[in-house]
Amino acid sequence: MQITDVRHHLTTELGSPALFVVIETDAGVTGYGEATIHFFPQAVAGLLDDLRPYLIGEDPRRIEHLWQMCFRTLFMRGGPVTGAAISGVDMALWDIKGKSLGVPVYELLGGLARTKVRLYGHVSGDTAEQMAENARERVSRGITAIRFRGFHVYDREEVHDHQMAVDQQVEFTAAIREAVGPDVDILIECHG
């Protein structure tokens, strides 16, 4: 089996960019992966284009070999763009291997650990009202846990006001809780 094509598809249908990797083989098996980062998705797409000639003609079942080849081929070996691109390729290769063996990928990774996974809905907005409305919309679709990025008040022209960020966090959390009620879990992402 050999890789015959590596493509990507960028969509913003859900409001945020999502970049998908498609790897095709001469055996008719197609693998799909996700290479999404929310900033600079075109940079990831460009890196996937750069990796394409190195992957075509290779055996997609040699996942570790191809991961190492992709990593070592790149001049810039670290960071989110490289990580996203290689991750998308890696997922697509695992998808191909699972399909070619007739087993789900989780069987290749050690077997079934649970029968279901709880999802959360991410919400965003610049105001408490926007956050609350977005949270209500997610709950109306059956989501039982809401996640949002906390402490993100900043003005690129000003020094970060930590107290303003804490005050906004309290305001956003209260607005979301009021919008979704007591039975929906709230998760606060505290990165970056």
Predicted features along the sequence, with ranges:
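General structural feature for long, well-ordered alpha-helical segments within catalytic domains
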Residues: L47, R62, L66, A85, ...
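Short Gly/Pro-enriched turn/cap motifs at secondary-structure boundaries
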Residues: H9-T12, V81, A85, S140
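Glycine-rich, aromatic-flanked loop segments that form ligand/cofactor-binding clefts
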Residues: D90-D126, Q130
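Structured beta-strand/loop patches that form or line metal/cofactor-binding pockets in enzymes
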Residues: M1-Y32, T36
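Metal- or metallocofactor-binding catalytic centers and their adjacent structured scaffolds
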Residues: D26-L101
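Anionic group-transfer/hydrolysis microenvironments
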Residues: R7, T36, A92, R149, ...
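Metal-dependent enolase-superfamily TIM-barrel catalytic cores that perform enediolate-based chemistry
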Residues: K116-G192
